[in-house]
């Protein structure tokens, strides 16, 4: 399994890059916000299966890497485009350019979310019995559950917030 790690990582990022054109095409039909939500739902379904994958089922984990990587393609392409729409709308609504402020705010929120994930995830996995110095089956399962299901919680919240986001292409025009 350890020797396959580079292939899993390559599959993940290659799927992200290759999926971007498909996400962009879908966003022209569904809108950016809902397309991003569809991608997050794909990641949710893929991540939900991880604790159910038997030890050594590398093909199944490879499929998870490809699916979550494809979802990453939307994460890379759509939020910056949505941000640009927000900047344009804000400039029109406020009558002044505040792009620097808005991008700084977005960057700060992203860093806060990452810090929150680490600040909650690592103590939680330790509390559930994972010890990297002495890996046990229950500890390994706890790590797997946190790795897979912890992002699901935040993605479900994100989908709920983004699905009906009122600023879309029609409102900008």
PLM regions with names:
Residues 1-173:
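Membrane-embedded alpha-helical bundles of multi-pass transporters/translocases
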């Amino acid at each position: 399994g350890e020797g396959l790690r580079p292939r899993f990582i390559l599959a993940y990022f290659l799927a992200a890059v290759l999926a971007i054109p498909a996400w962009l095409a879908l966003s022209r039909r569904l809108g950016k916000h809902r397309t991003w939500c569809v991608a997050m739902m794909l990641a949710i379904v893929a991540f939900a299966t991880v604790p159910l994958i038997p030890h050594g089922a590398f093909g199944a984990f490879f499929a998870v890497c490809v699916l979550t990587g494809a979802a990453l393609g939307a994460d890379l392409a759509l939020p910056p485009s949505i941000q640009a729409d927000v900047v344009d709308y804000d400039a029109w609504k406020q009558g002044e350019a505040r792009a620097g402020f808005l991008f700084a705010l977005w960057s700060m929120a992203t860093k806060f979310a990452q810090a929150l994930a680490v600040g909650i995830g690592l103590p939680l996995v330790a509390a559930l019995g994972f010890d990297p110095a002495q890996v046990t089956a229950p500890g390994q399962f706890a790590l797997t559950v946190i790795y897979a299901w912890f992002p699901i919680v935040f993605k479900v919240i994100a989908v709920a917030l983004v699905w009906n986001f009122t600023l879309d292409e029609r409102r900008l025009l």
